[in-house]
Amino acid sequence: MGERKGQNKYYPPDFNPEKHGSLNRYHNSHPLRERARKLSQGILVIRFEMPYNIWCDGCKNHIGMGVRYNAEKKKVGNYYTTPIYRFRMKCHLCVNYIEMQTDPANCDYVIVSGASRKEERWDMEDNEQVLTTEHEKKEKLETDAMFRLEHGEADRSTLKKALPTLSHIQEAQNAWKDDFALNSMLRRHFREKKKAMQEEEEKDQALQAKASLAIPLVPESEDDRRLAALLRLHTLDSYEDKQRMKRTEIIHRSWFPSAQGPSASSSKASSVLKKLCQGRRPPPSSTGTVGDLGIVRRKSRDVPESPQCAADNSLSEEQRRPPGTTQGSKTLEEAAEASRTSKTSESKRNCSDQAFPLGSSQEDLLNPNTPNASLVADYSDSESE
């Protein structure tokens, strides 16, 4: 039934084909409906598409190529036998009207009023495009032999100039002639690239898992490699490496202690002795006196030097005497006498320190409670038998 819809029309009883001719005349209508409302004036409303970019003169807005309008179309002239049509339309952004018409001579559209064209045209000859041959030139080529000969020479010179380009195009076409080989090469290239991408993705995932990174990694570049080569990373040794280094150091260490200098050993020994003497000094005790113990202190004021101290003093004086000195030199004698006097006093002090230990006196020695005390008896008043 679908193919009969266009034919099944209702004809009223008063319809007379001789009088009305058609149903459109009977209903006083047109098949194009509203688009033919100005058909009596020779104007037909059509859908016009903008052929190029323009600027509206009313609102100064840009109207792009391909925008469609309801335009009034009418015939305004002929170019030879080709009619020239004019289109009038209203801008959709303002109340301005734009008029354009065809240009059969140049195969183009011309703006009559209401807009200005965005100039994007170029010369076909400068663009090395194929130019259309005009009608007069065609007639001249057919009738004038000399003009045809000159035109042939110009064509041959143009061919010589275009020969390298044509040969390059031909080589490119021959290179892409074998479809199967090209398809195989392209698929092989895609497989290699896909494999490389998978390996790179696995490396990135391993690095992200090792460093606990949640950010995506970008592919490295040549600048990144050059910058990384200039840097030196010093990683911290692990606990096992430190233990291994300590054991290696212990193994290669000498079994015997290194010998220290005499000055260091003597200073260390003297400091230890002073600490011991200070620690052994007891607090003074008030219990007991010398009379209670029955001990009489020696009446002599000077403490006699021990034989060892006297020998040391004489030996030190002989060593300090410079060799080759004469008895008659007063300067050397005075210097030796001064040094001898100072050294003698120092030796006496040392001997007294030996008689009375460090931190002790005669009273401390007479005190029996002290650890360094010693009993001294005086028998000068007793009669020898």
From Swiss-Prot:
Chain residue ranges for the region called Disordered: 1-26, 257-385
Function: May be involved in mRNA splicing.
Compartment list: Nucleus
Gene responsible for this protein: Yju2b
Primary location: nucleus
Protein name stated in the entry: Probable splicing factor YJU2B
Family annotation (PANTHER family): SPLICING FACTOR YJU2, SPLICING FACTOR YJU2B-RELATED
Modified positions (Phosphoserine) in chain numbering: S40, S306
One family name in Pfam for this protein: Saf4_Yju2
Family: Belongs to the CWC16 family.
GO BP annotation list: mRNA splicing, via spliceosome; response to virus
CC annotations in GO: nucleus
Keywords, comma-separated and alphabetical: Coiled coil, Nucleus, Phosphoprotein
Bias type Polar residues, positions: 359-373
Biased composition (Low complexity): 258-271
Coiled-coil region: 182-214
InterPro entries reported for this sequence: Saf4/Yju2
